[in-house]
Amino acid sequence: MTKLMELSALGARETMLAQAMNSHNLANASTPGFRKDLATYAGTRSTDGLKNGVDLSPGTVQTTGNKLDVAIDDSSAQGEGYLVIETPDGGEAYSRRGDLRVDLDGFLVNGAGQFVMGEGGRIAVQRYNEIEIAADGTISIQRLGALPNAMQRVDRLMLVRLDEEQTMVKGEDGLLRIEDGSEAIPD
């Protein structure tokens, strides 16, 4: 009887965790760049139970009209790419969240206020009349008082891709990291 009760309790726990995961996915369905969690179960002999996975399939691209919003083109030969985001501890994490803006301190951040990294580190944008991000990720500005066609390169978005053997995990902050702690390959 005790074994039956243990199995029932374990089944109820796994169902509760799966429902919580589904609720979280539903609540964030319209968040730009959100990657849904996947409930995966170990084999029948495993005692590990429910595992978290992450859906890395591309989301839908939405046209916003915002000049700073970007979407990563998956049709390239290198496969999926990710923006590099600076974590609060100065580390590196990855995201496909492309709703970008310039914060009050002049840095390029995503919609969650996380620093988007360029090839030269954090992307600092001086005061400008015009700003654009080219298809290759190059960020250019027309400085205040400059001639209308005088665009100046600021930096280029740092994009990375995964090695076939690397596995992504999603942190509580919604950012993706490589499971073994290695870094992604620059794109």
Q: Where are the model-predicted features located?
A:
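Amphipathic alpha-helical polymerization modules
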Residues: 1-187
